[in-house]
Structure formats: C-alpha cells, structure tokens
C-alpha cells in the first residue's frame, strides 16, 4: 500500500469539514442586526441600550461621543456654536433573497464536490489503489 499518511489525514480532515459544514453560517449574508447583548452592529448603528456607535455619535442618554463633542442637550449653554443640521437616517442594507439562495446553492455544490473527493480518497485508502503514472 503506497498511500501516504498525509493524503489519508487530508481525507479525514475533509470528511470532518463536510460533516460540520452545515452548522457554519456565513456572516456576510447575515443582515446588519444588533446582537443579543446589544452592542453596536457592523454598520455602526447604536444598540438597544443607546450607547454610542462606532462612528462616535452621541447616544440617547445625552452623553458625549468618542470625539468629545457634547450632544444637543449639553451644547445649548454655548451661544457661539452653530446650529447642527439634522442628520439623515442611516439606510440598512437589504441583501436580496436571490443572492442568499445563490450563495447557498454554491456552498452546497462545493460541499458536494469536496464530499465526493473525500469519499474517493477514503475508498482508495481502504482498497489500496492509487493512481500511479505508467512508466
């Protein structure tokens, strides 16, 4: 049997990856939602507790942001400041369903191809046949 231990280990690793691959989730396809603890999401929007977001804007409780600027409640005492323009609401990015389903189909196709390769490697290891170039 001329099958190396490296190819057998690779076949086992691929088989384990296929077994555990349905439990994995692609974060890029997940929407920009806050997590269960309430931290800011990936797009920097404030969480459920009103804390400052990743871009340093003031929270709902009137605290200063990360850049040291006071919010509207505290800046009223200064008469030299210019009135701030109202900010536009941030748009949430909506990923179309056809993109999500297409990514799922591609993932399943890749997992199927890897599964076929792993099964053939395991079968070759069990039977003891390997493809050798003819001389």
From Swiss-Prot:
InterPro entries linked: Pilosulin
Residues linked to a glycan: 120, 129-130
Record PTM text: Glycosylation is critical to maintaining the aqueous solubility of this protein, but does not directly contribute to its activity.
The organism of origin for this protein: Myrmecia gulosa (Red bulldog ant)
Official protein name in the record: U-myrmeciitoxin(01)-Mg7a
Lineage: superkingdom: Eukaryota
Span list, region Disordered: 69-95
Family: Belongs to the formicidae venom precursor-01 superfamily.
Propeptide residue intervals: 22-72
């Amino acid at each position: 049997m001329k099958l190396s231990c490296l190819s057998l280990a690779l076949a086992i690793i691929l088989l384990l990856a296929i077994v555990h691959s349905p439990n994995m989730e692609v974060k890029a396809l997940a929407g920009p939602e806050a997590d269960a603890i309430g931290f800011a999401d990936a797009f920097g929007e404030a969480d459920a507790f009103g804390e400052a977001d990743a871009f340093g804007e003031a929270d709902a409780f009137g605290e200063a942001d990360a850049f040291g600027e006071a919010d509207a409640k505290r800046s009223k005492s200064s008469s030299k400041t210019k009135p701030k323009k109202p900010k536009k609401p941030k748009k949430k990015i909506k990923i179309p369903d056809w993109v999500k389903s297409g990514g799922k189909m591609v993932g399943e196709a890749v997992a199927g191809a890897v599964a076929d390769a792993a099964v053939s490697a395991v079968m070759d290891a069990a039977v003891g046949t390997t493809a050798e170039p003819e001389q």
